[in-house]
């Protein structure tokens, strides 16, 4: 507290956490290797065998600087003249001390190594039907090293090692030269990111919630089914309708909880969930060099939660999934000679209301409200080697609003 000489009933409260300065150092490297072989047995059919290797490593550490004002106790005659007490002279005299803090729990190291092999083939059993079959094997080794509260640097380690098979099937049936039907089925994986898996406390932006990763996270697996109708017109015009269904095994969700009286965001695997929806997409040439594109989708999601879990709402949609999504773009691309071209684009996006963080232990869900964004981009190609680009994002400049449901009372 700093007393005020003229108005003794008011106080300036020191909040070392809010005035703290935070610096993060991230060192990350990634190595990739690919090898593929292809055999053709006729003009339209082939077999492909491939191998992939990926090794990604991260080293992150944080340093905090705190202002220690314990020795500073001036009488302030002008609250608007902060230079009278927050100045270099008081720092030199030791009245204000800047403390540099590096703690083991503020650092982590993480890595992910993936060995994979795949086999795929394209062939035409009939003239109108294209079949694409694939099978991928992956051996992944993901790990994170960190320190618990009061522990030594990188003293704890969590491993997430998996061996998985990912089959895929894609069918395309050409009804006629302008109409086709596609069907696809696949199994895919959602791995926790390093920041989701590392039990490291951080903030995404000033004033936002504290976030801590969860070292107990497991992979999420997705079973995807899509059916799509496409119609192609002249000048690149296109219309498509897609229906899809996804079964989600152990999806990763962002949650919010109470720890030490403060709200803390983290991540957790739900039991399972599903998503089903329909999407409409079109591209249309309006006049020469002017095109309009748009797509809109509706999606229904549902999550099954553990019976004995601490989730506040037992029935809800999937975290992060918007039921309504829409995009539209208007592009103008005239050419001036062989190399010069102007590209102007106006891009609109609508993202419906969605759960930003799932509430547990009586805390309500945090919902992100519907968001509209409008971006503009311009580019001009002088020749094959030089381009000028301009990008202006968020022309509408609307607020991103999060609303938290009321906390439910708990009986103790």
Q: Whereabouts are the PLM-identified features?
A:
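Residue-level signature of outer-membrane beta-barrel architecture
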Residues: 39-41, 119-125, 129, 163, ...
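Signature of Gram-negative outer-membrane beta-barrel scaffolds
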Residues: 20, 36, 40, 44-176, ...
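Single conserved hydrophobic/aromatic residue that forms the stacking wall/gate
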Residues: 2-8, 12-13, 401-412
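Repeated loop/turn-to-beta-strand initiation elements of outer-membrane beta-barrel proteins
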Residues: 44-47, 128-131, 178-181, 235-239, ...
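Transmembrane beta-strands of outer-membrane beta-barrel pores
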Residues: 25, 29, 53-59, 137-143, ...
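Membrane-embedded beta-barrel scaffold of Gram-negative outer-membrane proteins
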Residues: 181-182, 190, 216-268, 274
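Gram-negative outer-membrane beta-barrel transporters
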Residues: 35, 244-247, 266-355
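Conserved C-terminal beta-signal and adjacent last beta-strands/turns
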Residues: 19-26, 35-40, 46, 169, ...
């Amino acid at each position: 507290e700093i007393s005020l000489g003229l108005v003794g009933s008011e106080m300036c409260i020191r909040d070392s956490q809010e005035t703290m300065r935070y610096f993060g150092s991230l060192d990350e490297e990634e190595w990739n290797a690919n090898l593929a072989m292809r055999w053709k047995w006729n003009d339209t059919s082939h077999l492909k065998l491939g191998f992939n290797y990926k090794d990604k490593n991260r080293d992150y550490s944080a340093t905090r600087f705190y202002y220690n004002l314990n020795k500073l106790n001036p009488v302030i005659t002008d609250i608007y003249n902060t230079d009278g007490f927050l100045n270099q002279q008081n720092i030199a005299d030791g009245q204000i001390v800047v403390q540099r803090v590096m703690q083991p729990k503020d650092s982590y190291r993480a890595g992910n190594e993936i060995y994979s092999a795949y086999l795929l083939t394209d062939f035409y059993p009939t003239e109108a039907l294209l079949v694409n079959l694939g099978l991928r094997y992956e051996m992944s080794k993901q790990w994170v090293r960190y320190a618990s509260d009061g522990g030594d640097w990188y003293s704890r380690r969590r491993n997430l090692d998996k061996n998985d098979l990912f089959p895929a099937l894609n069918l395309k049936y050409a009804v006629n030269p302008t109409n086709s039907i596609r069907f696809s089925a696949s199994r895919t994986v959602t791995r926790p990111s390093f920041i989701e898996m590392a039990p490291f406390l951080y903030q995404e932006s000033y004033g936002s919630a504290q976030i801590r990763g969860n070292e107990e996270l497991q992979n999420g697996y997705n079973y995807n089914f899509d059916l799509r109708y496409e119609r192609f017109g002249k000048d690149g015009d296109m219309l498509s309708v897609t229906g899809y269904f996804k079964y989600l095994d152990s999806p990763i969700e962002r949650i919010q909880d109470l720890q030490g009286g403060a709200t803390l965001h983290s991540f957790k695997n739900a039991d399972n969930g599903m998503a089903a929806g329909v999407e409409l997409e079109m591209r249309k040439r309006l006049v020469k060099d002017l095109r309009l594109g748009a797509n809109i989708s509706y999606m229904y999601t549902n999550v099954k939660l553990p019976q004995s879990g601490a989730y506040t709402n037992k029935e809800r949609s999937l975290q992060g999934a918007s039921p309504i999504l829409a995009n539209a773009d208007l592009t103008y691309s005239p050419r001036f000679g062989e190399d010069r071209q102007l590209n102007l684009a106006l891009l609109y996006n609508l993202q419906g209301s969605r759960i930003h963080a799932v509430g547990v232990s009586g805390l309500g869900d945090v919902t992100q409200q519907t968001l509209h964004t409008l971006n503009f981009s311009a580019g001009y190609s002088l020749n094959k080697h030089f381009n000028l680009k301009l990008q202006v994002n968020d022309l509408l400049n609307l607020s991103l609003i999060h609303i938290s449901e009321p906390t439910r009372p708990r009986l103790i």
